[in-house]
Regions:
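Donor-sugar nucleotide-binding helix/loop cap in glycosyltransferases
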Residues: 38-207
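C-terminal coupling/interaction segments
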Residues: 24, 37-38
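Juxtadomain coupling helices with adjacent low-complexity linkers
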Residues: 27-33
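Conserved beta-strand-loop-alpha-helix hinge in the C-terminal portion
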Residues: 1-25
Length: 207
């Protein structure tokens, strides 16, 4: 992709901004659901890698998008500039929100869903409840961890069993990262507790 602008580049130049928009659109197009190609975009499974995105970062972006001047729909380059984020950081964040059905990426833009608006407008308890619902519905790994805990008489489960299952589908490094993200997200939503030293999930201290 040729960039016909000499250094230093004027970021306010309309032609330059248009090119940035076009690049963002190309990079996010793959994330846009195509009704005619449903088979090419299968639903998430337990083997779906989860990015190392924290809930504070997701909350911050949702709040930013819900507030003026965006009011739920924003141009990705504008958001990246406002938050002083690089594209490589913003896209995984947007994709995490899309996985949770809290936002949608479309042709270089990001748009809040109704669930995303509810989260952004809610208090702490509402947000945790909304996040828990999203995890149960759209992140099979977290849903499976909670299901196993619910079904066991002592409501405990070793992280090893889930890590081993993930390693059937991805590298040990990706499996470890995916499990860390699942733990972080599940804890925030108060779906389970996790003992780091024992590497064990439980329902202790969960209301």
């Amino acid at each position: 992709l040729a960039v016909p602008f000499a250094h230093p580049r004027d970021r306010l130049d309309p032609a330059f901004r248009q090119m940035v928009d076009d690049i963002y659109a190309l990079m996010t197009r793959r994330a846009v659901p195509d009704p005619k190609a449903h088979a090419a975009h299968p639903a998430p499974t337990i083997a779906t890698p989860l990015p190392p995105i924290g809930t504070n970062l997701m909350s911050g972006l949702l709040e930013t998008l819900a507030a003026p001047p965006y009011n739920g729909h924003a141009d990705l380059p504008a958001v990246a500039s406002a938050l002083q984020m690089e594209l490589d950081d913003l896209l995984p964040l947007g994709e995490a929100l899309q996985l949770l059905h809290l936002a949608v990426l479309e042709e270089g833009d990001i748009r809040l869903t109704e669930a995303g608006r509810t989260f952004a407008d809610g208090d702490t308890d509402t947000r945790k409840e909304q996040f828990a619902q999203a995890l149960r519905a759209h992140v099979p790994l977290v849903a499976q961890i909670r299901q196993v805990l619910d079904e066991r008489w002592n409501h405990r489960a070793s992280a090893v069993r889930f890590r081993d299952e993930l390693e059937d589908h991805m590298s040990p490094e990706y499996a470890a990262q995916t499990l860390r993200t699942a733990i972080s997200w599940g804890r925030y939503a108060e779906l389970f507790s996790y003992d780091e030293e024992a590497e064990q999930f439980s329902l202790e201290d969960i209301e």
